[in-house]
Structure formats: structure tokens, C-alpha cells
Design a protein with these regions (language model features):
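Asparagine-centered polar/low-complexity signal
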Residues: 8, 23, 74-76
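Domain-terminus/edge residues, biased toward the C-terminal soluble/receptor-binding domains
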Residues: 16-17, 28-144
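Short, charged, amphipathic alpha-helices and their helix-cap/turn boundaries
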Residues: 2-19
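Short beta-strands and strand-loop turn motifs
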Residues: 19-25
């Protein structure tokens, strides 16, 4: 509970007025909520932390428990597959559905896409790919 309070303090500091945390794990609770826009803002902030960015950008790694190796894999199906994807996080609860926050870097552009409430993993991935490809095909960076 104390950690969730710290999370709420950070949300206020970041100007996230439509976000409230109850638990650190994000499982369903009526008072635990956010918006796609505020998830994007939070992701932008979090990805500036090198340790966080490295963790969410790692496809797989081996950890040791009682001197026994155990491989853990990132559940973001786009990481290491779709050009420019550098992270971030999948999620699922019964109320939220299947969710995916993705950061992609291409052609001097850095975008964050948010998919919430997908029915299946396949839909979540397809919707994310469509958002990413649409954005990079329709928007360009210009020097002013």
C-alpha cells in the first residue's frame, strides 16, 4: 500500500490527473485506473530511466534461483521482431483485457503506442503493429 501511495505522488508530480494506483501490481480494482494518454506520458518518463529501459527492452535473459539457471522471456511479441521496437510492457486482467504499451524508434522519430482492451493476444499485437506502421507512414520529422 505504501508503494502505491508513492506511485500516486509520482503521478501527481507528472501531471497525471486521471490516474490513481491502489496496488503496485495493477490487478483489477475499481479505484485503480488510468488513461491511454497518461500511460503514454508515464512511459515517456519511465523510458528515460536507463535501468528500466534496459529491462523492458530485453527479449530474454537467464536468472539463477538456488544456483539453478532459469530463462525468463519478455511477453512483448514485437520486441526483436518489428523494426525499431525498443520495449515496453504487456498486460492483462479480466477487466482491462489484453494491453500493450510499445515504444518504437525509427527515422529520428520516437513514438509510444497504447493498445487497451484487446480480446486476444493476436488482436493486441495486430492493433499495435497497425498503429506503429500507420504513424511512421503518415508522419515525418521536419527541421524548423
Amino acid at each position: 500500500k505504501e508503494f502505491a501511495e508513492l506511485m500516486n505522488e509520482k503521478a501527481i508530480e507528472l501531471g497525471l490527473t486521471n490516474t490513481h494506483f491502489v496496488t503496485p501490481h495493477g490487478l483489477d480494482d475499481a479505484n485503480h485506473y488510468t488513461t491511454a494518454l497518461e500511460l503514454a506520458k508515464l512511459t515517456d518518463y519511465a523510458m528515460d530511466n536507463e535501468t528500466f529501459a534496459k529491462i523492458v527492452g530485453t527479449k530474454s535473459t537467464t536468472i539463477y534461483i538456488n544456483n539453478q539457471p532459469r530463462q525468463i522471456n519478455n511477453t512483448n511479441e514485437l520486441l526483436g521482431v518489428l523494426n525499431g521496437v525498443v520495449g515496453v510492457k504487456t498486460g492483462f486482467t479480466n477487466n482491462a483485457g489484453r494491453c500493450l504499451v510499445t515504444e518504437t524508434k525509427r527515422n529520428n522519430m520516437d513514438i509510444i503506442t497504447i493498445v487497451l482492451g484487446a480480446d486476444t493476444k493476436k488482436d493486441r499485437t495486430k492493433d499495435s503493429v497497425n498503429l506503429i506502421e500507420y504513424t511512421f507512414s503518415k508522419y515525418k520529422m521536419y527541421n524548423l
